[in-house]
């Protein structure tokens, strides 16, 4: 998570691991846009102990970038320098109910899987996660939310590692305890940049009937399928709404984009979705540069039309490819 790139002689000296360490791994298959260049190396740790040992042994000059399921991300065409760490597989997707209202889940668990696990255990209040594409770790980084709820609303505690391999933990906003408090705002968190989230404890709003909760999730999924381009190569919402939820006369990013005449707008193989214009889609042959250029064009047109400067919600990272 530093801007410096390692010299070529650093990567051959990477620590031994029990998971997988792939040099020069293409990252496009790991992102929902299916674009982007390679990582100098991609590390898929077997478990927390494997991740901890790797970070402690890794040369501090080598940058580290955590990657979730790539649902809210544009990896630039020049790839990502240093080590990309992805928490994936059965271990990192584990979810366990702790009691009738709380559960714990590892950072690689899909948001939808967490919502369904909560439903199966009769825990209400986590249904909104079914509308968030991606994994729990990524949702934490952006304080993801929808349908009137955000991750911070349900967070009891989170655990993870700093870049040097030290273990850290934070309590959720307003939660009691001796741990330092994690601070969140609309689509933002003040957690350290080098933090790799590994596990969370979430609290529902109460107990309910599993079948009724599951029916609510199914209804939210059906609504999402009707209003968002979920079958396309896309991500979550491209831009954050200018106003936080609950703001009187809240302005929506998609309405501003539509009013600026951007619905269906194209740059190369990238397009503003005709179905929901706060989504960019890869029509088949887009590059990361196409997507980013289209996003900037949308921002410019919205600024000219309404005077509002939209803020990217999709993360963009990596090196710009030199032509």
From Swiss-Prot:
One of its GO terms (molecular function) is UDP-N-acetylmuramate dehydrogenase activity. Pathway: Cell wall biogenesis; peptidoglycan biosynthesis. The active site is at residues 187, 237, 313. One of its GO terms (cellular component) is cytosol. It catalyses: UDP-N-acetyl-alpha-D-muramate + NADP(+) = UDP-N-acetyl-3-O-(1-carboxyvinyl)-alpha-D-glucosamine + NADPH + H(+). It comes from the Bacteria. Its main location: cytoplasm. GO terms for biological process: cell division; cell wall organization; peptidoglycan biosynthetic process; regulation of cell shape. Its cofactor is FAD. It is found in: Cytoplasm. The keyword Ligase does not apply. SUPFAM superfamilies: FAD-binding/transporter-associated domain-like, Uridine diphospho-N-Acetylenolpyruvylglucosamine reductase, MurB, C-terminal domain. PROSITE patterns: FAD_PCMH. InterPro entries: FAD-bd_PCMH, FAD-bd_PCMH-like_sf, FAD-bd_PCMH_sub1, FAD-bd_PCMH_sub2, MurB, MurB_C, MurB_C_sf, Oxid_FAD_bind_N. It holds the Pfam family MurB_C. Belongs to the MurB family. Cell wall formation. This is UDP-N-acetylenolpyruvoylglucosamine reductase. It comes from Hyphomonas neptunium (strain ATCC 15444).
């Amino acid at each position: 998570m530093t801007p410096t790139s390692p010299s070529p002689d650093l990567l051959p000296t990477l620590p031994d691991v029990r998971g997988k360490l792939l040099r020069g791994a293409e990252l496009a298959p790991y992102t929902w846009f299916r674009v982007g260049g390679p990582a100098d190396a991609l590390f898929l740790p077997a478990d927390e102990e494997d991740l901890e040992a790797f970070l402690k042994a890794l040369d501090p000059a080598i940058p580290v970038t955590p990657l979730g399921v790539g649902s809210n991300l544009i990896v630039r065409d020049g790839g990502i320098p240093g080590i990309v760490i992805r928490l994936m597989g059965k271990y990192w997707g584990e979810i366990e109910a702790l009691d009738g209202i709380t559960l714990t889940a590892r950072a690689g668990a899909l948001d939808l899987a967490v919502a369904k696990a909560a439903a199966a255990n009769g825990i209400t209040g986590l249904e909104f996660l079914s509308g968030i594409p991606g994994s729990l770790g990524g949702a934490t980084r952006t304080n993801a939310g929808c349908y009137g709820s955000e991750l911070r609303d349900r967070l009891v505690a989170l655990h993870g590692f700093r870049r040097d391999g030290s273990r850290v933990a934070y309590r959720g906003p307003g939660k009691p305890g001796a741990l330092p408090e994690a601070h969140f705002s609309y689509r933002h968190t003040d957690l350290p940049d080098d933090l790799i989230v590994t596990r969370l404890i979430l609290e529902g709003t109460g107990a309910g009937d599993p079948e009724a909760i599951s029916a609510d999730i199914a209804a939210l999924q059906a609504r999402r399928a009707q209003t968002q381009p979920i079958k396309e190569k896309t991500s979550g919402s491209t831009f954050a709404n200018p106003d936080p939820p609950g703001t009187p006369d809240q302005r929506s990013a998609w309405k501003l984009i539509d009013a600026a005449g951007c619905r269906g707008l194209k740059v190369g193989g990238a397009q503003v979705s005709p179905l929901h214009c706060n989504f960019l889609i890869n029509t088949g042959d887009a590059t990361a540069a196409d997507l980013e250029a289209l996003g900037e064009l949308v921002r410019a047109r919205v600024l000219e039309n309404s005077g509002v400067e939209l803020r990217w919600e999709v993360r963009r990272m990596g090196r710009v490819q030199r032509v």
